[in-house]
From Swiss-Prot:
GTP binds at residues 65-70, 200-203, 294-297, 351. Residues 198-206 are annotated as: G2 motif. Mg(2+) binds at residues 69, 206. A lipid is attached at residue 11 (S-palmitoyl cysteine). One of its GO terms (biological process) is negative regulation of vascular associated smooth muscle cell migration. This is Guanine nucleotide-binding protein subunit alpha-12. The modification Phosphothreonine is found at residue 206. The gene is Gna12. Guanine nucleotide-binding proteins (G proteins) are involved as modulators or transducers in various transmembrane signaling systems. Activates effector molecule RhoA by binding and activating RhoGEFs (ARHGEF12/LARG). GNA12-dependent Rho signaling subsequently regulates transcription factor AP-1 (activating protein-1). GNA12-dependent Rho signaling also regulates protein phosphatese 2A activation causing dephosphorylation of its target proteins. Promotes tumor cell invasion and metastasis by activating RhoA/ROCK signaling pathway and up-regulating pro-inflammatory cytokine production. Residues 349-354 are annotated as: G5 motif. G proteins are composed of 3 units; alpha, beta and gamma. The alpha chain contains the guanine nucleotide binding site. Interacts with UBXD5. Interacts (in GTP-bound form) with PPP5C (via TPR repeats); activates PPP5C phosphatase activity and translocates PPP5C to the cell membrane. Interacts with RGS22. Interacts (via N-terminus) with NAPA; the interaction promotes CDH5 localization to plasma membrane. Interacts with CTNND1 (via N-terminus); the interaction regulates CDH1-mediated cell-cell adhesion. It is found in: Cell membrane; Lateral cell membrane; Cytoplasm.
Length: 379
């Protein structure tokens, strides 16, 4: 009996040894595969880290209506991303809305300011326009907009409405209303599609966070626009991670205007207060902050007739001399900085002027790369 067992054992031993070798081989293969996968993951993570390190993330900050969204549109235009049909239709809807709402504001302001009509028959045009309501927030169709074009044209020609417009610092009126009303014959056509200039001047408050990605000399840029109204500012903190630079935008021409939110606070003072909070925040100690004093085209015109000294009594100089006003504006923001070791980079800009923004952003890009990305290796 024992001989039989020994014989069976000798027969089974090679089979067991082969199984052990196969198991060991499988384990070695699995280990090699695990090491390969680990190397692949490490390489992927390294590529992602390099990509994140190379990404230039620019945050656009500033009070409402300072020109952030217009600047972002310019980045799309300058870097070759055309607006598709859907976007053009949305801009058309926004432009119709800007015209109708702006004209209603002017009709209402004329009445409240006690300005008489030049032509009494325009009162019925005014009443027709004031009866317009779009409670559902639905887009205004071109055929519907055309019904209002005769009334809009007649009202815009009336000296009573023009006088109300000249006193627009006393109430809230969008800056693009004049441009659109001046171009009403073109915009009122049934087959109207917005031009690039129309798109730049279309005003719609930013809600939430809007991003735009583009590449310059193989360096990826991400530009982030966040709503500037007081109700939107709590969303700013969601965007602070990984910031390379902040472009802080100010409407330089609004020194005689108050906020839409409270109708008391001077708009320029509000911008200075926001800037002070941002520029002195420890989170941004190593972040370059570049000041854009925007709407230069409007500032040039306003300085001629509206004295900044009336609203800022500490102003020294000629209130109707552009260079004196510009110098004062830069000083106002510069005084808000506690860290005097870093320079304040600033530019006077006109966000609706593509060539101006192209030139300024070229300089800004160089500043950002020199100040914050000296370790970037261009491929």
């Amino acid at each position: 009996m024992s001989g039989v067992v020994r014989t069976l054992s000798r027969c089974l031993l090679p089979a067991e040894a082969g199984a052990r070798e196969r198991r060991a081989g499988a384990a070695r293969d699995a280990e090699r595969e695990a090491r390969r996968r680990s190397r692949d993951i490490d390489a992927l993570l390294a590529r992602e880290r390099r990509a994140v390190r190379r990404l230039v993330k620019i945050l656009l900050l500033g009070a409402g209506e300072s020109g952030k969204s217009t600047f972002l549109k310019q980045m799309r235009i300058i870097h070759g991303r055309e607006f598709d049909q859907k976007a053009l239709l949305e801009f058309r809807d926004t432009i119709f809305d800007n015209i109708l709402k702006g004209s209603r504001v002017l009709v209402d302001a004329r009445d409240k300011l006690g300005i008489p009509w030049q032509h009494s028959e325009n009162e019925k045009h005014g009443m027709f326009l004031m009866a317009f309501e779009n409670k559902a927030g639905l887009p205004v169709e071109p055929a519907t907009f055309q019904l209002y074009v005769p009334a809009l044209s007649a009202l815009w020609r009336d000296s009573g409405i023009r006088e109300a417009f000249s006193r627009r610092s006393e109430f809230q009126l969008g800056e693009s209303v004049k441009y659109f009303l001046d171009n009403l014959d073109r915009i009122g056509q049934l087959n109207y599609f917005p031009s690039k200039q129309d798109i730049l001047l279309a005003r719609k408050a930013t809600k939430g966070i809007v991003e735009h990605d583009f590449v310059i000399k193989k360096i990826p840029f991400k530009m982030v626009d966040v709503g500037g109204q007081r109700s939107q500012r709590q969303k700013w903190f969601q965007c602070f991670d990984g910031i390379t630079s902040i472009l802080f935008m100010v409407s330089s021409s609004e020194y005689d205007q108050v906020l839409m939110e409270d109708r008391r606070t001077n708009r320029l003072v509000e911008s200075m207060n926001i800037f002070e909070t941002i520029v002195n925040n420890k989170l941004f100690f190593n972040v370059s902050i570049i000041l854009f004093l925007n709407k230069m085209d409007l500032l040039v015109e306003k300085v001629k007739s509206v004295s900044i000294k009336k609203h800022f009594p500490d102003f020294k100089g000629d209130p109707h001399r552009l260079e004196d006003v510009q110098r004062y504006l830069v000083q106002c923001f510069d005084r808000k900085r506690r860290n005097r070791g870093k320079p304040l980079f600033h530019h006077f800009t006109t966000a609706i002027d593509t060539e101006n923004i192209r030139f300024v952003f070229h300089a800004v890009k160089d500043t950002i790369l020199q100040e914050n990305l000296k370790d970037i290796m261009l491929q």
